[in-house]
Amino acid sequence: MTYVSLADLERAARDVLPGEIFDFLAGGSGTEASLVANRTALERVFVIPRMLRDLTDVTTEIDIFGRRAALPMAVAPVAYQRLFHPEGELAVARAARDAGVPYTICTLSSVSLEEIAAVGGRPWFQLYWLRDEKRSLDLVRRAEDAGCEAIVFTVDVPWMGRRLRDMRNGFALPEWVTAANFDAGTAAHRRTQGVSAVADHTAREFAPATWESVEAVRAHTDLPVVLKGILAVEDARRAVDAGAGGIVVSNHGGRQLDGAVPGIEMLGEIVAAVSGGCEVLVDGGIRSGGDVLKATALGASAVLVGRPVMWALAAAGQDGVRQLLELLAEEVRDAMGLAGCESVGAARRLNTKLGVV
């Protein structure tokens, strides 16, 4: 089947996934106000295109963390991808490799980080801070040894947000899906009505990260450390002072603090505040190449895309993810050209205006 929009892939995923697994992917925390706001915020951003530009050689490539990428985009970390397709993370990594796009291996991946990184391409590793600091730093070492190019340190999960869909469903992992990077025990598989077994188990495994945790990670690796989950300008400035190679402006896809400001709302302020001191990425609600253009016009180095990649994985495995990335590449190039931009650098010089949705 050919998909012409990301919405097509969402519908296809909904058709094939069990309801509780689709809810695990789609849901946010609490009333899902931040989840909805992520889309609303993007829809309010309008780009002011430039005309009469030379568009004979439009390129969507960027340099990020010292290497070339085909798009101003990376695959976001998503846990337990074998929930959505038997090949899970391996299918996503292969498609991202072939598309020239970085992909982020999650601490809670359902295939080991070494197996995923062996696919090649541009793997990054996402780190959750565990109660045992030694285990956290061991994951960093393993990621570096496996060839990962950056450590994406998620800092907005002292514990999981209240994800009511999962609680109502009594969501638990099926026996054939595990956290492959460490012995996670069996708690996440124990189904209890009114309780998310995944959230309950995460609360036992995770610890709140602090600036001291950031320093410990930086001291343990030569890789760029990217802090994911930054929303306050003050935290962005401190991240630069702490030596972060990048930040991801993010409210965790609306899955942590319900009511947290959308990342796209804070992006311009944060880009101005860090003043080139580190790479600034953004995520939350990216659903088209036009959204990627909006983010770059607001100053983003790149965007992270999560849920749509999982829709594609569920719909058609590696081929689905390939189609998604090809579709986004086509949409990004099209949007850039229509805005009068021959490069991502030119897109970052576009002006924007907030409208009413």
Swiss-Prot record:
Cofactor (UniProt): FMN
Main enzyme class: oxidoreductase
Keyword entries, A-Z: Antibiotic biosynthesis, Flavoprotein, FMN, Oxidoreductase
CDD domains: alpha_hydroxyacid_oxid_FMN
Sites where the protein binds FMN: Q126, T154, K228, D283, G284, G285, I286, R287, G306, R307
Family statement: Belongs to the FMN-dependent alpha-hydroxy acid dehydrogenase family.
Protein name according to UniProt: 4-hydroxymandelate oxidase
Organism in which the protein naturally occurs: Amycolatopsis orientalis (Nocardia orientalis)
Lineage start: Bacteria, Bacillati, Actinomycetota, Actinomycetes, Pseudonocardiales
